[in-house]
Structures are given as structure tokens and as C-alpha cells.
Regions:
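Carboxylate-rich, polar loop motifs that coordinate divalent cations or form catalytic acidic clusters
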Residues: 1-249
């Protein structure tokens, strides 16, 4: 029997956090914690908090730029996606965030931003999905086949993705610069707003968190929906993840 103790520390504006509203938290390769707030980016090194403004063409942007999503890539790089189609990269050499991409369409409204395992940042709009490759800086625009606001994306393997909207979740394949929807029994007939997704590769199951209908799982092998015995009422499920590494159960 092994037991592990855990230490928790509360961090607030009184400790230097720029805003109480936190959109996302990531940990980089140095162990620093990054916080995406309503005012920009904060970095916590275990002792002090440093605030970062975002830079566009050598000009500091105001906090009213509608930031949305924060990701750390496999090499520890930090990326920020804005709701108006901007992408910012943390430059470790200069200790700053610089804009590396801006959507040419001023009207582009991003409902969800995502970083996949293929180094693509997804900027999901209602009519189209823009892919920005962090290695090559190449940009690709795909039609949004779901024709609805995308709420979450979850990668299953190198080419397959689950894409959720306010009306359900679909299984897709991205290959040869094209995205196509793959029909799945039962899952295609779920009509509810999806807030969160987690795919368990060993179990081959997709775990789904909804806005007001609790959680359920979809078994890819049996093509069955598995509902939890625990009733969560009208609790909105915003995030699902595995608490066990290399879990087989």
C-alpha cells in the first residue's frame, strides 16, 4: 500500500495574478505554470508571478482582444489562440508573446481553439476550420461540415477526430488535406450541447460531458452508449480527463 501526500497553494490577485477570471492553465517544460486570464498571460515560477502583454507588429495590445485558449506543445512551447483569429507564440529567447498569425477575415469568430498531436492549431468557426501548423507555419482552410458552432475537439489517433457542437458530436477523419464525417451508430443520434470530450485509447471509449445532461461514454468497439448511474442533474460538465496513467480499466 502506497500513499502520496499533496500540497495545495491558493494563488489570487493579492499574489500578483492579473485577474480572477482564468480561462486556461498549462505547465511548460521548465515546470512553470501559465495562466490565461482576462488581462493576458501570467506565469508562475513557484515564487513570483510575471504578467505578459501580447505583441502585434511590435505594438503592445490592450487586454480587450478576446483571448480564448492556451496550449503547451510537445516541446514545451506555449501558444495562445484568440477568439478573433489571432495566434500568439511565446518566444523564450526574448521572454515575450508575439502574434504569428492573424485571420485575414475580420469577421472570423472562433468558437473553439485546439492543438492536435500533428502540430496543427485548429481555429474553428461556424463556416470554416482554419489549421495553422506550428512547425511549417502553413495555413489550411477547411469547410465546417457540421455547419454549427464547434464546442470541443478531441483527437483519437493520427487522422481521426471527434468534433462536438451545440447539437451533438461527430466522428471525422482528416486525411489528404480533407475532412470527412464518418457515421457511427448511436452516437450520431445524440442531440445535446457537448462541453467536453475525452478519448481513452486503451478502452477505445469516448467520454462525453454535456451542458445539462450529465455524462456518458460511447464504446467504439460495441457501438453502444454507456450512461452513468450517478445523476448529476443540471450540472454543466466542462472538463473530463483520466486520473490514471496507462490505465487499462
Amino acid at each position: 500500500l502506497m500513499a502520496y501526500g499533496q500540497t495545495y497553494k491558493h494563488i489570487g490577485v493579492e499574489d500578483g495574478l492579473s485577474n480572477r477570471r482564468i480561462y486556461n492553465i498549462q505547465k511548460d517544460h521548465q515546470g512553470y505554470m501559465w495562466f490565461l486570464t482576462n488581462e493576458g498571460m501570467d506565469r508562475y515560477n513557484g515564487k513570483d508571478i510575471k504578467h505578459y502583454k501580447l505583441i502585434e507588429e511590435n505594438k503592445q495590445l490592450s487586454s480587450e482582444i478576446h483571448l480564448g485558449w492556451l496550449y503547451a506543445d510537445k516541446e514545451g512551447g506555449i501558444w495562445v489562440i484568440g477568439k478573433k483569429g489571432r495566434i500568439f507564440q511565446y518566444e523564450e529567447k526574448y521572454d515575450r508573446f508575439t502574434m504569428v498569425y492573424k485571420s485575414p477575415k475580420v469577421t472570423d469568430a472562433i468558437s473553439y481553439g485546439y492543438l492536435d498531436r500533428n502540430n496543427n492549431l485548429w481555429l474553428c468557426g461556424k463556416d470554416s476550420i482554419l489549421l495553422y501548423n506550428t512547425k511549417t507555419t502553413q495555413v489550411m482552410r477547411l469547410p465546417n461540415l457540421l455547419e454549427d458552432n464547434i464546442t470541443v475537439v478531441e483527437q483519437a489517433d493520427d487522422t481521426h477526430f471527434f468534433i462536438a457542437t451545440e447539437m451533438g458530436v461527430r466522428y471525422t477523419q482528416f486525411e489528404n488535406e480533407a475532412l470527412k464525417v464518418i457515421p457511427l451508430d448511436m452516437l450520431d443520434h445524440v442531440y445535446t450541447q457537448i462541453n467536453s470530450l475525452y478519448f481513452h485509447p486503451q478502452l477505445h471509449r469516448l467520454f462525453v460531458g454535456t451542458f445539462s445532461d450529465g455524462t456518458f461514454a460511447y464504446d467504439m468497439s460495441a457501438h453502444q452508449i454507456i450512461k452513468s448511474d450517478t445523476k448529476l442533474g443540471d450540472v454543466s460538465i466542462t472538463h473530463i480527463n483520466s486520473s490514471l496513467k496507462n490505465s487499462q480499466a
